[in-house]
Amino acid sequence: MKMADFVNDGINVDEIVIENQENPNIFINPFKSNPHNVTLSSFRDARIYDLQIRDRPDKYGSGWEVQRSYARKRYGRWMRTVRKNPGFENFRRQPIEVLQTVEDEFGNVYVIRKKINFRAKLPQNMVRRNDGGKNRVNFTAQSVQKGINVDDQDFRPKMFTPKMGREISALRNKLGLTQTDLGKRINVDANVIRNIETGDLVAFNVQDPMVRSLAYALGIRTIKYQ
């Protein structure tokens, strides 16, 4: 494959610091060479960036190089350009180590460690070795019986229903308490009492200390979900 299409563009000569070396190397233009023959040292040659040094070797001599940091930046940009070409997607990429589980006909499970190319499509039973670092667990609602649609309501937390709110409001008025007074007794804000009496706004759990305190303040044994 010829690399004549890789044009050396976007070079700012002001960013380059050119130094003279005693042992010059053979000039290799990385943008017109086989990518397998190009190395990081190829981008240190100042003749790539300054046409005067390349066209007038009798005047400027040879062995001029740029600083290594600039050559590394240009090498990385060239590498990304090469990898955009078909067949060079994994050019000079380190393979990824993965673990694959295999089960034989006797039910024995084996774990095989292998290396694959970067961005290769992983099989369904293959997991990257470094995967799962975030310890994230995703739960999906599924029915125990096959063919039955799952209702999202079954997986939502229980809330104080409007019917429960009306009964709590009636008990509060029977005791002659306002929403603020009842909230002070159970150490909550009056807005919480208002949301409980409205319904479908506050989570209900019979083991919640707030729910137990509310039942005690209203003079009942427990609050039943209905």
Curated annotation (Swiss-Prot):
Domain HTH cro/C1-type, residue spans: 168-226
Record's keyword annotation contains DNA-binding: yes
Keyword tags: DNA-binding, Transcription, Transcription regulation
CDD domains: HTH_XRE
SMART domains, sorted: HTH_XRE (SM00530)
UniProt KW S-adenosyl-L-methionine keyword: no
Molecular-function annotations in GO: DNA binding
Any Pfam family hit: HTH_3
DNA bind region: 179-198
Protein name in the entry: Uncharacterized HTH-type transcriptional regulator R559
Organism: Acanthamoeba polyphaga mimivirus (APMV)
